């Protein structure tokens, strides 16, 4: 379950950003007191025009950025005080994927597994499971720059 209570995210603007935004305020409210409960099995879509705060909301849920105010919980874990637990429960994938074009999906999986202290045995077993599940085996050793957008999303 995802619980959001009065989520607010305010960005501070520098002078250049204020000029570009044609504003005298040094604050930009990206999300303003959003509340939402998403229960297990439910599917939600965040709809709105550019600048409405959709991506900012998702980044707060995924612990990529911290809320200015409010509370966000994922599976009962607070995104600020229990970020590690939250990240074990969810993933976040944007349409703008930033992967090193020289890497392969196989290399990335090994690299991040080792980075998080996963043993070789567990890493091998988990990689086999996930590559099979997501259909990555056929392109596991191709460089990211050779992959289609869909393949990149699977690798990410």
Predicted regions and their residues:
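Conserved ABC transporter NBD signature motif
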Residues: 70-81, 85-86, 90
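Helix-to-loop junction immediately C-terminal to a conserved catalytic motif
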Residues: 62
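Walker A (P-loop) phosphate-binding loop of ABC-type ATPase nucleotide-binding domains
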Residues: 49-53
């Amino acid at each position: 379950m995802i619980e959001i209570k009065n989520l607010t995210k305010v960005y501070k603007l520098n002078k250049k950003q204020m000029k570009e935004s044609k504003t005298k305020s040094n604050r930009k409210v990206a999300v303003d007191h959003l509340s939402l409960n998403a229960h297990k099995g439910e599917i939600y879509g965040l709809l709105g025009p550019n600048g409405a705060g959709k991506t900012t909301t998702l980044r707060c849920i995924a612990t990529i950025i911290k809320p200015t105010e409010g509370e966000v919980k994922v599976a009962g874990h607070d995104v600020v005080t229990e970020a590690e637990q939250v990240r074990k429960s969810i993933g976040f994938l944007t349409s703008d994927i930033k992967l090193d074009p020289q890497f392969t999906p196989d290399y990335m999986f090994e690299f991040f597994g080792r980075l998080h202290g996963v043993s070789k045995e567990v890493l091998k077993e988990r990689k086999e499971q996930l590559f099979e599940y997501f259909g990555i085996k056929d392109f596991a050793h191709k460089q990211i720059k050779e992959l289609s957008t869909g393949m990149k999303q699977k690798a990410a």
